[in-house]
Amino acid sequence: MKIAVKSGVEQLSLFENTAFPYYEAYLRLDEDLHALLDTKMKLVALHMPSMIMTPRGKAGVDFAQEGEVADACFRKLEELLLFASENGVSYIIIHLGFFNSFRETREDVLARVAQRFNKLSCLGVKLCVENVPRWTTLCFEHEPLLSNVEHLTLFQKMCPAIGVTLDIDHLAIDTVFGYFEEGFRDRYIFESDRDRFQLIMEQEMMAQTRNSVALFTEMIQSRVVDFFEKIQPDTIHAVGSDFCNYELVEGKLPLRGEALPLGHDGMVQRMMVVDRIDHKIWLSRIRACGLITLELHLRSDYDYIRMMKENYEFVSSLIP
């Protein structure tokens, strides 16, 4: 099993004087792929960019959106598969896309998308779909197709060759939103100011999670155990998460309590934030994972490289 760091192209220079052996590249769209090979770290995974170029300009990556967006996504994916195959890159990780849950069923959209994925030639590269959490800005009319283990299991039945990337932080975020979703959906339908209601949802979730820390801790731990009982992921994104601080700051992702160093206990954007995930639970359940990627957001609140080193030592000490 390999342990990698996740880096955008802009952050690669930060790792020049480190001894990390492997990295997963988070692509932005316009980089020279071959330049990613010119590093001391070995490139072992590509994370598909969040944007894609279409004949009408940039658009968000969404394999489920029919027409030119999906066509552009598959063209880019085929380019990445060829590059990965030719250069010994083992994994490509993608976010599958979104659907309008008021107009379509998840099953119908996944079945349509799976037909096209089943025609892909992956050239010996493992293509993995990542769990993407539902949240106030990613729900209902624009809901991720693959948010939890049930969704991933369904897609694997339709597309047997597909691999899975489990993002621990995303699992926690989706677990919290899932607890409130039914009640929010009933109110959302009749809400005229939906932007305002997104803020209300966030405020209500923060209030309840802070008042019921033990409940949500147990809930997330249970979902982690359930995930590993149903799927052994091919790769894992190891990320800290504070479910008491899932809050957009100045309207920008990541959430304050998202994408934290493992075991973090300190200030983030002028608030005290604590990683509330018991990472020993998932680390002890790994059986077939080939890659663990350390992922944390580059913030001024902590020493990014030092946190990466500490996280690397922590995970190394606990992997089976």
Go through the PLM ranges and name each one:
Residues S7-L36, I52-R56, D62-A64, E68-C73, ...:
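Acidic-and-aromatic substrate-binding clefts and catalytic sites of carbohydrate-active enzymes
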Residues P55-A70, C139-N148, L171-C289:
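Gly/Pro-rich active-site loop or hairpin
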Residues L27-V44, K76-E86, L110-K119, N148-M158, ...:
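Short amphipathic alpha-helices and their capping/turn segments at secondary-structure boundaries
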Residues R28, E68-A72, R116-K119, H151-F155, ...:
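Glycine-rich loops and low-complexity Gly/Arg-rich segments
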Residues G57, D62-L166, A172-D174, Y179:
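Active-site acidic/histidine proton-transfer and metal-coordination neighborhood
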Residues K2-S7, P21-A25, K42-P49, I92-I94, ...:
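Hydrophobic faces of well-ordered beta-strands that scaffold small-molecule active sites
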